[in-house]
UniProtKB/Swiss-Prot annotation:
One Gene Ontology term, aspect cellular component: cytoplasm
Positions of the J domain: 3-67
Protein name per UniProt: Chaperone protein DnaJ
Name of the gene encoding the protein in the UniProt record: dnaJ
Subunit structure: Homodimer.
Pfam families in the record: DnaJ (PF00226), DnaJ_C (PF01556), DnaJ_CXXCXGXG (PF00684)
NCBIfam families with a match to the protein in the record: DnaJ_bact, PRK10767.1, PRK14293.1
Organism, scientific name: Parasynechococcus marenigrum (strain WH8102)
């Protein structure tokens, strides 16, 4: 599923009212009774799921930290009954037009502080790191507030001045005539970019941008139980904001390397072990590899090829609750010899004779079976 914030078309700092308005607008757009296009109903359900998760502070916090992996089925399908009125739809449609009743009426166009962009960092970790978690150092390139000008973008002793194009409003207005009447369209000032200010004497260190790109070392905590696709959020380590706005966040996307002998299946670990046919028949105690180190495994007498034995609590810790762990399931592979020595063959034929309930006839039958099995005549 797509990112929940993207589905609703809101930023990650959106408050409850913003989320609600966005949900109503999107839900109406994709409601199956209104939108008959293929895929509209699926998108309608996705939007409902996104709103249900993000409107609850606890599930939103888990989603922000771990993505969908952190939800663990905590939220179900959303009730779509509350569509709300048409006010938000009309507000969205008329946003940007002035005049009586227009959505832009009384709204300041000058840009204030803006939050910095979020950043993505892809990190590959070992299988054992994913199981037990670890603190790891990474280096990221990101924008930080310029320490020379303090983020103002201007040289020392100078500062921003009011934009002469928009008079400091950050917006310019343009009259448009339509069959429905005249409208005044409000657009961002092209000279100042909506800030209402221009910098006549820019800072040499940052070129008037107020930010500089640097490489920064971070130590991030990888929790136990993560998997490929898990997303970790590092608050405030994205790009620096503009005009005193807060920094964005850093999102670390994990990829887990495969293990040569162990394989993950949910919270369980799968592995195989080879035993001889005598160990399978008589039983034995062996050591097998686990993420906790070599562990003793009992092979019961009469173990059949393909039997799966369980090592309890040797699996993957549950993300967010590392005390709960899965199991390791060990499939027993019985190795048969391709050739037998004469004494081995004699002993096996004697065993086959004793085991047969039909005497000599069965003895000859089993003898032929061993010959075919081990390639001897």
């Amino acid at each position: 599923m797509a990112d929940y914030y993207d589905l609703l078309g809101v930023g990650r700092d959106a408050d409850a009212d913003t989320l609600k308005r966005a949900y109503r607008s999107k839900a109406r757009k994709y409601h199956p009774d209104i939108n008959k296009e293929p895929g509209a109903e699926d998108r309608f359900k996705e939007i409902g799921r996104a709103y249900e998760v993000l409107s609850d502070p606890q599930t939103r916090a888990r989603y922000d930290q771990f993505g969908e992996a952190g939800l663990g089925g905590a939220a179900g399908a959303s009730d779509m009954g509350d569509m709300g009125g048409f006010a938000d739809l009309f507000e969205t449609f008329f946003q940007g037009f002035g005049g009586p009743g227009g959505a832009a009426a009384g709204r300041s166009g000058r840009r204030g502080p803006q939050q910095g962009d979020d950043l993505r960092y892809d990190l590959t970790i070992d299988f054992e790191q994913a199981v037990f978690g670890q603190e790891q150092e990474i280096k990221i390139p990101h924008l930080e507030t310029c320490d020379t000008c303090g983020g103002s973008g201007a040289k020392a002793g100078s500062g921003p001045t009011t934009c002469g194009t928009c008079g400091g409003a950050g917006q310019v207005r343009r009259a448009t005539r339509t069959p429905f009447g005249s409208f005044t369209q409000v657009a961002e000032c092209p000279n100042c970019g909506g800030t209402g200010q221009v910098i006549a004497d820019p800072c040499n260190a940052c070129g008037g941008q107020g930010v500089r790109q640097v490489r920064k070392k971070l130590r991030i905590n990888i929790p136990a139980g993560v998997d490929t696709g898990t997303r970790l959020r590092v608050s405030g380590e994205g790009n620096a904001g503009q005009r005193g706005g807060p920094s964005g966040d850093l999102y670390v996307f994990l990829t887990v390397k495969s293990h040569p002998r162990l394989r993950r299946d949910g919270l369980n670990i799968l592995s195989t072990v080879n035993v001889s046919y005598l160990q399978a028949i008589l039983g034995d105690t062996i050591e097998v590899e686990t993420v906790d180190g070599d562990t003793v495994l009992e092979i019961p007498p009469g173990t059949q090829p393909g039997t799966v034995l369980t090592l309890a609590n040797k699996g993957i810790p549950k993300l967010g609750n590392p005390v709960a762990r899965g199991d390791q399931r060990v499939q027993v592979m019985v190795q048969l010899p391709t050739r037998l020595s004469d004494p081995e063959r004699t002993l096996l034929e004697e065993l086959a004779g004793h085991h047969s309930a039909r005497g000599k006839q069965h003895h000859h039958h089993n003898s032929g079976l061993f010959a075919r099995l081990f390639g001897q005549k």
